[in-house]
Amino acid sequence: DAGDAVVDYIEHVLFASALPPEEVAAVMLEPIQGEGGYIVPPPHFLPRLRKLCDEHGILLIADEVQSGVGRTGKWWAIQHWDVEPDILCSAKGIASGVPLGLMVARQSVIKKWPAGAHGNTYGGNPLACVAALKTLELVENGMMENAAKMGEYILDALAEMQARHPSMGDVRGKGLMIGVEF
């Protein structure tokens, strides 16, 4: 599939002729591409990319700013492919649009980051923290399951419309992260 072709290209073309893997610190991606049209990757792409990163000691960073916090029916979109990133970043959805960011990482990554190495002058905003707590409460009380259920319903309805309307192109998505081409 296309995902295999991309990973093969990275390994056999980019790494072989343009950029040695030992010079690559990390691969950062959106598990479901947001601004590019809600592009859902082929089934084998993320697992193969995870394996490639592991083979070369490259960190895999998941940008879940748009796709995270239950929007796709799972806490994080990358979970649809049973892939665990080394670092995961999120924002927006974690506090229902109130400015707040989140970064989590494997212990093996965090232990290399000394205490005090990361800080800011505007952290701990009480409003953002309350918004995040309420958002997490909603997610834990069925929002994520509802996103999965409603996403299936909407994708099925769009597929039926697509069969009747030739102006509709591709219909794709996970949960409530849905894209339609016209």
Which ranges hold each PLM region?
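Conserved N-terminal phosphate-binding loop of PLP-dependent enzymes in the Aspartate aminotransferase
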Residues: 1-182
